[in-house]
């Protein structure tokens, strides 16, 4: 979708007020469909994210012979075929924009008896895949990439996999998950040790589906040959989507919002710690557990933020929230320093460069480094922002527009539907000044 046909005009609205139901967690939705498809029996998924990425994953499993019913937009009923019941696809498997889908599927499909090809959109086709194909090759998998290690992935079936003790050079939940899923089919035990703990959605959900798996922060181990038992999953609200409203309510004077039943996986919530370090007023109420995941209502009130040094230990736990954090830093008094975040350069866009360039366009001083940036808080001006088709960049600058002295035009926003369908409507409902222009 070209920037000229679909963009936002963001300008100051009102103080943000309301109680919000954020769409379901994308990471949990991907895994819920995958594991339900591999389980013995029928699983019901409630709170499923009806976004393009998760629809791509569900469509892939339909092509692999799994029957999936859709009683409502946020519900899926999955008729599992068992770990050995997937059928050979008759066409390529299109992951769309979903890096999670492609990397996890690489681990799963590497163990099947048939060949398959995983493709993605223009953005996903630029993303690095050797971090996944490397350890899978150590297990005996045969996966071919482009010469530069990017998709498409040609997965050769019929390989006998063996367990490995993998010491990952990168802190990536997707790499860990791909190895663990291949490990379900491998001879012997498979373990993953990480340089820093990452999100443990895969471990928690495999356990919910009856798999015996030992895991602690930074480590996971399972043995091959186990089966999955069907189970019903309630998907929590997506923290990464909630993040935009958490930041917006923190920086727009007079705001007070409640975000209901948000997933608070401890490996996901680094943004809360970072914002609290900057002086944010964020309360947690009604703690519960959904599908093995901790959830709570978040009560966010406006508070003046001050710049801070963001601890590197928080970086893996907020890697998707940095676009929102950069806007909080721009609104804060003083300097905010981010280091240890080189991973941001290989997301849907080079998010460090995109955020730095965009904030400079709006008059904010940003000193970029190879693995981070120093953001100098100040007054946010007007300008035209290129989101580079990155949904999180687009939503971050919609927040910036709420503090603008004029207006912020955010181009190329169609991809917001990959993770947060209906973001613009929900934002308008709580008080954002936000208009959608052009054609979808």
Curated annotation (Swiss-Prot):
Monomer. GO terms for molecular function: 3-phosphoshikimate 1-carboxyvinyltransferase activity. It comes from Xanthomonas axonopodis pv. citri (strain 306). Catalyzes the transfer of the enolpyruvyl moiety of phosphoenolpyruvate (PEP) to the 5-hydroxyl of shikimate-3-phosphate (S3P) to produce enolpyruvyl shikimate-3-phosphate and inorganic phosphate. Pathway: Metabolic intermediate biosynthesis; chorismate biosynthesis; chorismate from D-erythrose 4-phosphate and phosphoenolpyruvate: step 6/7. This is 3-phosphoshikimate 1-carboxyvinyltransferase. Its EC number is 2.5.1.19. PANTHER family: AROM/DEHYDROQUINATE SYNTHASE, PENTAFUNCTIONAL AROM POLYPEPTIDE. Keywords: Amino-acid biosynthesis, Aromatic amino acid biosynthesis, Cytoplasm, Transferase. The gene is aroA. Phosphoenolpyruvate binds at residues 26, 99, 127, 174, 351, 392.
């Amino acid at each position: 979708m070209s920037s000229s046909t679909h963009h936002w005009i963001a300008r100051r609205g009102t103080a943000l007020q309301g109680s919000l139901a954020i769409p379901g967690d994308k990471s949990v939705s991907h895994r819920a469909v995958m594991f339900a498809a591999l389980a013995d029996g029928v699983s019901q998924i409630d709170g499923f994210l009806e976004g393009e990425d998760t629809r791509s994953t569900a469509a892939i499993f339909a092509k692999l012979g799994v029957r999936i019913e859709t009683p409502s937009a946020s519900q899926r009923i999955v008729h599992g075929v068992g770990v050995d019941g997937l059928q050979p696809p008759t066409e390529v498997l299109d992951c769309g924009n979903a890096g999670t889908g492609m990397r996890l599927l690489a681990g799963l499909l590497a163990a099947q008896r048939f060949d398959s090809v995983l493709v993605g959109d223009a953005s996903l086709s630029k993303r690095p895949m050797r971090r996944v194909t490397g350890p899978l090759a150590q297990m005996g998998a045969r996966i071919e990439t482009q010469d530069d290690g990017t998709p498409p992935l040609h997965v050769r079936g019929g390989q006998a996999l063996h367990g490995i003790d993998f010491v990952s050079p990168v802190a990536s939940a997707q790499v860990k998950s791909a190895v663990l899923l291949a490990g379900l089919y491998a001879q012997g035990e498979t373990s993953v040790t990480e340089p820093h703990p990452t999100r443990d959605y895969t471990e928690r959900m495999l356990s919910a589906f009856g798999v015996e798996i030992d895991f602690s922060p930074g480590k996971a181990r399972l043995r091959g040959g186990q089966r999955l038992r069907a189970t019903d999953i309630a998907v929590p609200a997506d923290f990464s989507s909630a993040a935009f409203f958490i930041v917006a309510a923190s920086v727009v004077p007079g705001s007070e919002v409640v975000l209901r039943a948000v997933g608070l996986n401890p490996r996901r919530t680094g943004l809360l710690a970072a914002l609290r370090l900057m002086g944010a007023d964020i309360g947690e109420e009604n703690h519960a557990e959904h599908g093995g995941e901790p959830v709570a209502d978040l009560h966010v009130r406006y508070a003046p933020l001050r710049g801070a040094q963001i601890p590197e230990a928080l970086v893996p736990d907020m890697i998707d929230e940095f676009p929102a954090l950069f806007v909080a830093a721009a609104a804060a008094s003083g300097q905010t320093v981010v280091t240890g975040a080189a991973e941001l350069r290989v997301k849907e866009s080079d998010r460090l460069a995109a955020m730095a360039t965009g904030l400079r366009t709006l008059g904010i001083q940003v000193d970029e480094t190879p693995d981070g940036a120093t953001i100098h808080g100040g007054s946010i001006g007007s300008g035209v922002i290129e989101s580079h088709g990155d949904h999180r960049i687009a939503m971050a600058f919609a927040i910036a527009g709420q503090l603008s002295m004029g207006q912020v035009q955010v181009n190329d926003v169609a991809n917001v539907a990959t993770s947060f369908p209906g973001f613009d409507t929900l934002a308008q409902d709580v008080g954002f000044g936000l208009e959608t222009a052009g054609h979808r």
